[in-house]
Amino acid sequence: MSLDINQIALHQLIKRDEQNLELILRDSLLEPGNTVTEMMAELHRVYSAKSKAYGLFNEESELAEALRQCRRGDEDFLAFSRAATGRLRDELAKYPFAEGGIVLFCHYRYLAVEYLLVAVLNNLSSMRVNEQLDISTTHYLDINHADIVARIDLTEWETNPESTRYLTFLKGRVGRKVADFFMDFLGASVGLDTKAQNRGLLQALDDFTAEAQLDKAERQNVRAQVYSYCNEQLQAGEEIALSELSKELPSFGEKSFQEFTAEQGYELEETFPADRSTLRQLTKYAGSGGGLTINFDAMLLGERIFWDPATDTLTIKGTPPNLRDQLQRRTSGK
């Protein structure tokens, strides 16, 4: 992994009681040795693999202005990180989920792109066995479960300030409150809506195949092609590119899929991240509620599974063997 650390700083927030978060600030930067570089490579990998929301700085963002000053050389990175940790403490203190932790600021480069990553990591205790087979306690950073993380693509921000996606943050296990916290701390607003982009793609695809008057098998084949391309992009960590996707699909009436989306005004970006849960709808029908969960391949609709919209009834012909076995045992009273 080609990851080069420019500067990295660690500070700490300690929750002393329900009202106060104590601030402990380092007086120097960390040396980016092998251990630190390995830690950042792991954090970069974990962060890149997780679902993220996108944003952009507001005009009045204090963090953005401080970052500009740091980039111009008006303030050094350590001073920037210390001041930002103070603002972070003030914002975190507003939320009941705030537990403190190790605050990390890292300016690094990965594949010719510069990033600033900000994270609050839990410092956990565990057990270890040494060479003499004695057991002792040890501490470690819980990187795999980090959910208070934000990253700024400095290259994108500085070369394309009109972008709506240079700032990303994790949605977090405690839901919307973490997103609100990041918006407040970063002085940012929501940017590119990846789910909306993916939903727009699916709607455009349905309209495209409908206009071409394809039969069910042909429509399903096109949807499978789109899913295959998008899933490959997702697995490779790449974005969906409309021009590339359009080349994968047949043209109907001398009109490509990309031309169709542009003419119909779907407002799709030229490239955008794939959303796994939304794209799954290309090949699956799924839903849950009221104690019922249903998930089946799209090709089965109209063949083994039938929906009557008038009565909102699904009829399934041929149940899975393990489900049938359970039904038989339960209904027979065994």
From Swiss-Prot:
Belongs to the YejK family. GO terms for cellular component: bacterial nucleoid; cytoplasm. NCBIfam families: PRK00378.1. This is Nucleoid-associated protein ESA_01050. It is found in: Cytoplasm, Nucleoid. GO terms for molecular function: double-stranded DNA binding; single-stranded RNA binding. Keywords: Cytoplasm.
